[in-house]
Amino acid sequence: MAAITAALIKQVREDTGAGMLDVKKALTEAEGDVARAKEIIRAKGIAAAGKREGRKAQEGTIASKVVETANGETGYAVELNSETDFVANGQDFIAMVQEILDQAVENRCKTIDEVKTLKLANGDDAVTAVQQRSGITGEKMEIDGYNFLEGDNLYVYDHMNRHMLATIVRLSESNEDAGHKVAMQVAAMKPIALDEASVPQSVKDEELKVAIEKTKEEQVEKAVVNAIKKAGVNPNLVDSEDHIESNIKKGWLTPEDAEKAREIRAKVGAEKAANLPEQMVQNIAKGRLNKFFKESCLVDQEFQFGDGDKLNVAQWLQAQSKTLAVCDYRRYSLSAE
């Protein structure tokens, strides 16, 4: 059995990142054999990681970069999660996500599955390496996200340099200032699509359905409120059964007026709902849908980083250059939004 010296412990610690006590135990079990000790640490780390599968890893780090390629540029973003920001802010954790990003760039990965099978410097694939690290930190860790964007004139933004929110935008022409500001716009305003045409039809259909229902409810409620007012009852006192009961107890509403309001709500509400002009409902609903597009589509959003002019993103870009436009974007955030 080889002597377990301080130098030997230091070597294994540096190679594995494991704690001193774990290294000493592994070396003792391996009778001083460094290779066996590393394998013991590795196996224990993976086993421990498996026990944490049910736990949530909501903290972490997003590493991102734009690189020059033969065909232009490519922007990459990799997300590695942990359970606490203490682990996520550790040098070893940051080094690991950076290594995964570098390998993704080198291998031009296009999917998260490709990223997970990447071979890292220690010879393990990325998932196995993360599992080993999880065993050392005592926290669940996982590669939870990956994105890339190809094309010329790419700009990446790391919000507040905290590696928790990253965006990549592609412009029609080179403009560093515009690229940075549009990338900040994406971070701040959370667009769901580039433009109206890019919004999935299923989303459009659902938003229109919601807008129609809301419009009908508002029109019916408006008719009911007007009828209750004409009957001499304060509509604010009878807007729900809870309020009616409460206001009767307080003496603010008589039982007779309460019953009158109930009858009006039932009768007028049913009549109005049955006779709503369909075209009017459609017009109002489409107006709501257009508002949704203006708030949710990047090019139509009000630009947040201009000089106070009420311009949308597309208009602001054209004010910088007639041929300047945003062509695509990616947004990645650790938090559920």
Task: Give the residues covered by each predicted segment.
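N-terminal assembly/interaction segments in proteins that build large macromolecular machines
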Residues: 2-337
